[in-house]
Design a protein with these regions (language model features):
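N-terminal pre-ligand scaffold of iron-sulfur
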Residues: 2-88, 102, 116-160
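Cys/His/Pro-rich metal-binding microdomains
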Residues: 74, 91-94, 108
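Aspartate-rich (DDxxD/NDxxD/DxxxD) Mg2+/diphosphate-binding motifs
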Residues: 81-83, 107-111
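Hydrophobic alpha-helical packing residues
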Residues: 93-96, 135
Length: 524
């Protein structure tokens, strides 16, 4: 059904009949993105989750292939993610040393066996095996099929990952990824609601000139529809026009490949490429969802609203004043850190200007969290809780109708996972950055670790310099030599200032809540 503005108020509220037999989406028969490969630690086990399943991924050093197992040792159910990767490609449990072949989960070593025969017998038992899952690397991402055993291997073998289905092909560049502290439904709704950007993110347009209460020149959407014949168990396609003055002439399509992929293509009025966006989602556990992003702007105006801020005269002055310290920090990173290249990647994620992307994420999260909590409190079907009277709401309606018709209305979690916890999270939890991104990214963890080392070195240097300054002050007084003491004391002060600056940098990786003053960020 095509939705267009008429003389009457257009509505996005449509009815989706229940799916017929065989038309239901199977949540456990699909590829899910786990991490960009660049985020994974190639030397250690990586703790992961999807659909409530606790998983561990590691790189087999013998064949350079990623293995995915259930994060549970069959011996005493300790997390295998606490273990270590051995040279022979097996994953050893740190609790009692049991070792597993990541390819099929078979147990290959039980160190506490009384003899070789007993070990062989125990390893041959199916009860000694860890649970392995089909996995693959595609488009720079590690994917998992969340059904184990022969059924999972057979079903996954011929099934493509969502990114390979994009008619326009994959996008260039690296994937970004965060774990949103909100559930799957509000996260996907946000993606199918493009007009929210003109209000929620209004102040962060590319020019940086808007008042915090202003919108970015919105244009009412007059067309937003589900492409005829596309609403099926495997997804759907929606088409819409522009929604602000910079993209008023565009035509866009958003292809939803269930359960995780939304690929958007924007064309300008002449049919030329305007903007491409690939966004992936994976429900990790109730109330948390992975989001992967990759964008390609084909025209300059397509970056409007991307979160940039106009450089002010104060910014330029500050840049000049801090230039010597910046150069010294760059020298330190290049010469005194464990992996300068990796540290720089982490710094580009976690510190300004790269960390400015957190501002937009914070805005989205606060809004989505509010929606999720209110829906929980009302405990009503979405059609009763939401009032969707405009064409701009058609994307949300389309997604909700797909969920109702084909996906059972909600995520199907792994056995034993119950979605009964309160959706209410404190503002500090919503604005947390460590669990949103840092802990998932090996570059950010490395950068944060190195900043901790630098802080300790700055504090130690200040102590030694201050002690030296006091000594030089005493001895210098006898010889009328005050300059060395003054220099040492100034350097001690500079080291303390440096340590405080490094603490500020570390905080950027941990939270959007300000480190000083009122614990509430200014987002608009």
């Amino acid at each position: 059904v095509r939705l267009e503005a008429t003389s009457e108020a257009a509505t996005a509220e449509t009815y989706a009949p229940p799916a017929a037999a065989g038309e239901s989406f199977d949540w456990f028969s699909a590829w899910y993105p786990l991490r960009p490969v660049s985020f994974l630690d190639a030397n250690e086990p990586n703790e992961l989750r999807v659909l409530g399943k606790k998983l561990v991924a590691y790189l087999d050093p013998t064949c350079k292939e990623w293995r995915v197992l259930e994060d549970s040792c069959p011996h005493r159910r300790a997390p295998l993610s606490l273990g270590y990767v051995q040279k022979d490609g097996t994953l050893a449990c740190r609790y009692h040393g049991w070792a597993f072949d990541g390819k099929d989960g078979s147990c290959v070593s039980i160190p506490m066996s009384v003899d070789e025969a007993a070990e062989k017998t125990a390893c041959a038992s199916p009860r000694s095996c860890a649970t392995s899952y089909p996995s693959r690397v595609e488009d720079g991402i590690l994917w998992v099929w969340p059904t184990a055993g022969a059924d999972g291997l057979l079903a996954s073998a011929g099934a493509p990952c969502a990114t390979s289905l994009a008619r326009e092909g994959t996008l260039p560049g690296e994937w970004g990824m965060v774990e949103l502290p909100v559930g799957y439904a509000p996260a996907l709704e946000n993606q199918f609601d493009p007009s929210h950007a003109e209000w929620l993110h209004a102040r962060y347009d590319a020019e940086g000139q808007l008042d915090e209460r202003a919108n970015a020149g919105f244009v009412a959407m007059t067309e937003f529809s589900v492409r005829e014949g596309t609403m099926q168990k495997d997804g759907f396609v929606v088409e819409h026009g522009g929604y602000n003055k910079s993209n008023v002439g565009v035509s866009a399509s958003r292809v939803f490949t269930a359960p995780c992929s939304s690929r958007s293509e924007y064309l300008d009025a002449k049919g030329k490429k305007y903007l491409s966006a690939a966004i992936l989602y994976a429900p990790t556990e109730p109330g948390r969802t992975l989001m992967f992003t990759k964008f390609q702007a084909h025209q300059a105006s397509a970056v409007q609203g991307a979160g940039a801020r106009k450089v002010s005269p104060a910014d330029r002055i500050n840049s000049l004043v801090t230039a010597p310290a910046t150069s010294l920090f760059d020298f330190y990173v290049d010469n005194f850190t464990s992996d300068p290249k990796l540290v720089r990647v982490g710094l580009s994620h976690g510190t300004p200007p790269g960390s400015s992307a957190y501002n937009l994420g914070d805005q989205d999260i606060l809004a989505m969290h509010g929606v999720e909590v209110e829906m929980e409190l009302q405990n009503k079907p979405w059609k009763q809780s939401y009032y969707l009277p405009t064409p701009a709401d058609a994307g949300v309606s389309a997604f909700r109708n797909w969920m109702d018709k084909h996906a059972g209305g909600k995520v199907a979690w792994a056995p034993g996972v119950v979605d009964d916890a309160s959706k209410v999270k404190s503002e500090a939890e919503q604005l947390d950055r460590y669990h949103r991104h840092t802990k998932h990214c090996v570059a950010c963890k490395t950068a944060l670790s190195e900043l901790g080392v630098l802080e300790e070195r700055c504090v130690a240097a200040s102590k030694y310099l201050l002690a030296g300054g006091l000594f030089l002050a005493v001895t210098g007084a006898a010889f009328d030599q005050e300059a060395p003491a003054i220099i040492a004391t100034c350097l001690a002060g500079a080291s303390l200032v440096g340590a405080e600056k490094v603490r500020d940098m570390q905080h950027e990786f941990l939270s959007s809540v300000p480190r000083r003053g009122v614990p509430k960020p200014k987002l608009w």
